Amino acid sequence: TQLNDLSSYYNNMGLNTDGEFTEEVKTAKEQMDKEGLKESESMADEIESALKAANVDNQVEITATNKYVMLNMNGGILFNSGEADLTPEAVSLLDSVAGAIYQYNDNYITIEGHTDSNPINTAKFPDNMMLSVHRAHSVYNYLVNNKGFDAKTMTSSGRGENVPIADNTTAEGRAQNRRVEIKIYNNLNSDIQ
């Protein structure tokens, strides 16, 4: 009876007897991924149009995945070196970004801060992780406190130098790695977080 119980358990979980997903589950996941990508691409088009209208599309890189739309903003525009306070240019850019994404305020939104690999050790920021946490939180605070975004559907976190998108051995690569990413999850994935 234990084998029957195990077989029943696997079937209820959408798994075959080898513990692998059944073809039905795989097909459903592929379909959900396609629908998610289609929705994210539509969101990305709307956001990009709004950023173009605000004449800031050259300051934000937009990527659509099957789960979310990611806005990548260069940290050099947002912050002075070694600081987490928003620059006046950052406030202007975030005003435009907020206008472009506010329609998705009910969706789950994450804000991630990233740094290059150059070590920092100040009284305020003992390492890059703390700097990235504070930078992400500065963007979060601005959007929640100044632009009316819902704190219940938005989070901020820092990743330090742990998720580079370019080579940290060059000045250009380090500049690309200093960034803040805003991820707006599509409707299919907003409730899953």
Can you describe what each PLM-predicted range is?
Residues N72, L78-S96, A100-Y104, H114-Q193:
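Periplasmic OmpA-like peptidoglycan-binding domain that tethers envelope proteins to the cell wall
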Residues T1-G75:
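Juxtamembrane linker/hinge segments adjacent to a transmembrane helix in small membrane proteins
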